[in-house]
Amino acid sequence: MVTSSPFKTIKSDEIFAAAQKLMPGGVSSPVRAFKSVGGQPIVFDRVKDAYAWDVDGNRYIDYVGTWGPAICGHAHPEVIEALKVAMEKGTSFGAPCALENVLAEMVIDAVPSIEMVRFVNSGTEACMAVLRLMRAYTGRDKIIKFEGCYHGHADMFLVKAGSGVATLGLPDSPGVPKSTTANTLTAPYNDLEAVKALFAENPGEIAGVILEPIVGNSGFIVPDAGFLEGLREITLEHDALLVFDEVMTGFRIAYGGVQEKFGVTPDLTTLGKIIGGGLPVGAYGGKREIMQLVAPAGPMYQAGTLSGNPLAMTAGIKTLELLRQPGTYEYLDQITKRLSDGLLAIAQETGHAACGGQVSGMFGFFFTEGPVHNYEDAKKSDLQKFSRFHRGMLEQGIYLAPSQFEAGFTSLAHTEEDIDATLAAARTVMSAL
């Protein structure tokens, strides 16, 4: 038991009840409302290292990590100190900032596909801009995305989008005109033949293919052997662009992202989460000849009041400096593999069908025999069982993403003792399911 006192959520319940009168659903982002796992959401008071404390005093080992950015652990002292210094100079300039150059150089040095980069304020914003750029560069309107891959909440991407849409049980979102998504083609993840068929059916009309190279928004799904390489070949054959949405995987799977880990280089990449060190940030980048189309260098317009603000740049720079230290990704892989393998072994020992895995500091599992290759496979998971498991783990002091359709994250702050405690809690909970 990780919590130091009997599990109670009185204050969380009170705050959430009040929030429901002030904000739609009581939250600022849908998955936080615990809709898919039942019960009331936990209201956090503070976070530090690998832990979170709620307003009732319960402590949790946190495997959400503010949905990925907290790869060095929450409130890392070096990041906090750097932010204190930066804040003394102002929170936003609305003008060029030397820190943008520093972070831009770090991103360009790290990510194989990026020769130039533009900073924005969120992953959604990065994906919106990169879609416009795909079309501007190719002169074509249609794109291919994959079922269950999430690229933010922009209208044109809310087609079989996984993540929060899947959590709420909605096929897509009201308010999105059919004309907006008419040029968004979809294929099952890991299905090269479906992609080839779409290109054959739409000759000379497809600007490119965008995907999460490792899916984290239908649960955790890895690419089959040859899938990413196949997409690269197909897009080159048709003079179309390949775009990796590495908002979640960038600087997490490896310092250079999935493209470094798997050796497949796209034309464009979107980033977010980790590159802001916990502050709002996004970025997109790629080949110089493509990026030169972005205003003011070129005609494709995109702008943002807070883009490249000094606080996000500062936190991002310090976070990437920490990640460059030797042994970082080896440690993440080691502890995450032990966690993932342990969860699957416990499920088997306690009689529950389960499958899953991990790559570096990202993991996930499903309550189904599997294997899970795509979104349709992911939907076979026993969602009611996951809900009971999630609640049980919460009461044991383990904070997991409140949706079967989200990946989990470890951090450099997680210890072997944290993994031990998590597996002990999982054994207790799965034995009682």
From Swiss-Prot:
It comes from the Bacteria. Pathway: Porphyrin-containing compound metabolism; protoporphyrin-IX biosynthesis; 5-aminolevulinate from L-glutamyl-tRNA(Glu): step 2/2; Porphyrin-containing compound metabolism; chlorophyll biosynthesis. Its EC number is 5.4.3.8. The modification N6-(pyridoxal phosphate)lysine is found at K273. It catalyses: (S)-4-amino-5-oxopentanoate = 5-aminolevulinate. Its cofactor is pyridoxal 5'-phosphate. GO terms for molecular function: glutamate-1-semialdehyde 2,1-aminomutase activity; pyridoxal phosphate binding; transaminase activity. Keywords: Chlorophyll biosynthesis, Cytoplasm, Isomerase, Porphyrin biosynthesis, Pyridoxal phosphate. GO terms for cellular component: cytoplasm. InterPro entries: 4pyrrol_synth_GluAld_NH2Trfase, Aminotrans_3, Aminotrans_3_PPA_site, PyrdxlP-dep_Trfase, PyrdxlP-dep_Trfase_major, PyrdxlP-dep_Trfase_small. It is found in: Cytoplasm. Its main location: cytoplasm. One of its GO terms (biological process) is chlorophyll biosynthetic process. Homodimer. Belongs to the class-III pyridoxal-phosphate-dependent aminotransferase family. HemL subfamily. NCBIfam families: hemL, PRK00062.1. This is Glutamate-1-semialdehyde 2,1-aminomutase. It comes from Synechococcus elongatus (strain ATCC 33912 / PCC 7942 / FACHB-805).
